[in-house]
Amino acid sequence: RDDELYYGDFGRQFRSNSDISVLLSNPLAFGVPTTKTPALLTGGYFHTAILEPDKLNRIKVIDASTRNTKVYKEMSEGELTLLQHEVDKIEILVDTLLANETARGLIRDGDVEYEVPGLGKVFSDMYWKGKADIINHDEKLIIDLKTTSDLDKLQWTAKKYNYDSQAFVYKNLFGYDMIFIAI
């Protein structure tokens, strides 16, 4: 469950669903580390707030209106970080998701595990890795949380980022069907 191992040198020796996306869209970028973006930071904070809220204090947040301000540039030390008003919006999303009885039940109730890494052979002798956001053993489901700026475009996002192959790989790694909860 160590992020350093999963995302570091050890983890890079195995294929992941992200690799499928890169190979399909830009094979020359295969193996190149992903650049942080505000959207990735937002999604990461949302996941942490839902799945590992005790780790939120490790995430740097700057109280500035934009990333172009002097305050932000001085405090960020050249690293992309979240702005306080972005965190405020994420907290509303967290509250909204957990206010939904069905979603909350799937995420919080019963025999559930969070941030579960998996490793195994999916295609012949090729090892694949995946990290399940939530495994609900009572419902026999893998639950993946997705944030989106536009729910109407989710079907295109699912195609672009190959949610179908993610579900296939995770089903093989963890043995349960996968559902996506998007907000």
Predicted regions and their residues:
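Metal-dependent nuclease catalytic cores that hydrolyze phosphodiester bonds in DNA/RNA
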Residues: 1-131
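Mg2+/Mn2+-dependent nuclease catalytic core
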Residues: 116-183
